[in-house]
Each structure stands twice: as structure tokens, then as C-alpha cells.
């Protein structure tokens, strides 16, 4: 599904990423690891087409993402440190905004129950905590048809139930042929044989 080939990126004229190469197949999960400042978030932004590399190429389904960036970006969903949530829209409206629904997608209320947010469904998201906004961003992810999920530190500061929910959704997405690339400082609660790791 995704091929990163000999990618280089400089930050303030200093090399940050050099010769980054890996393959992420359909159904795959790649855990991107590295210390703070190693370039994990930058690499996700490069893969999302939000930054341009100095050298190298990114292929999605064997085609360069540069060929039709707009179409490519509709195939992915990027959940980063910023939630991307509109504070003036309600939780429901944020989930519906610019979402490409899958046939038979689970209803918003049912998904909200996974994070015990159903009582806030018609509240403006500006009234939610930062953690709740991040959960809304994840709900949007789960409602999308995106094949490729790019998740920047999705497991930070989660309780055990929320962690289990996210891991379950990741596994469901993979079972349907989707692919997931995530960064995390912590080990994943999965068998090591069930995913790949890439160290920056």
C-alpha cells in the first residue's frame, strides 16, 4: 500500500531525516519509534503530503503521491497533536463535517459511547477538554473510509478502556485491508509478531 523510498528532509538547513525507507502493506501496522526531536511527526507530515522531502519518493498503491495529491489525501486520515476540531461546531457536526462515510457506518451516538461522550453529542466542541477533543478526532477517523491511518501519539494519557478501544479499532481497520502508521513512546499492547517497528 505505502512505500517510502530513500527519503531525506532538512530542518533549518540541517539534516533531520536521511535515507528513510520502508514498506507498509495493506493490513499492516508500523510502529514508528524514536526520541523527541528525531523527526517522527515530520515523517508523518511528509507521508501526508503536508511537507516536501529534499530527496526520495513516497508511493501509495504504487503511484507517486505527487501525481494526484488531492486524491491521495482523501485516502488517508491524519490524527496529530492538534485535534483539527472546529470549536464552534457540536461534537455531532464535527463528526459529520467533511467525512466520507462507509456503507453501513456505525452511528455517531454508538461510537460516542465508546468514549462515554454520548451526553455531549450536541455540545460545542469548544467546551470539551483537550482529551475529549482528541477522542472526537478519533471518532472522525473511525467514521471515514480512509485506507491509510497516520496517528501521531494516539496512546498518550489514555485510561485502560480507551487504550483497548483504540487498539481494537486499529485491528478492525487492518482486518478490512487498511494500513496504520503510528508513533508512540510506549510499547504497543500487541504481540510483537503482529506488527513492525521502525526506529529513527
Curated annotation (Swiss-Prot):
Single Gene Ontology MF annotation: ATP hydrolysis activity
Family matches, as SMART domains: AAA
Binding site for ATP: 34-41
Keywords: ATP-binding, Cell inner membrane, Cell membrane, Cytochrome c-type biogenesis, Membrane, Nucleotide-binding, Translocase, Transport
PROSITE patterns for the chain: ABC_TRANSPORTER_2, CCMA
Quaternary context: The complex is composed of two ATP-binding proteins (CcmA) and two transmembrane proteins (CcmB).
Function in brief: Part of the ABC transporter complex CcmAB involved in the biogenesis of c-type cytochromes; once thought to export heme, this seems not to be the case, but its exact role is uncertain. Responsible for energy coupling to the transport system.
Name recorded for this polypeptide: Cytochrome c biogenesis ATP-binding export protein CcmA
Organism: Legionella pneumophila subsp. pneumophila (strain Philadelphia 1 / ATCC 33152 / DSM 7513)
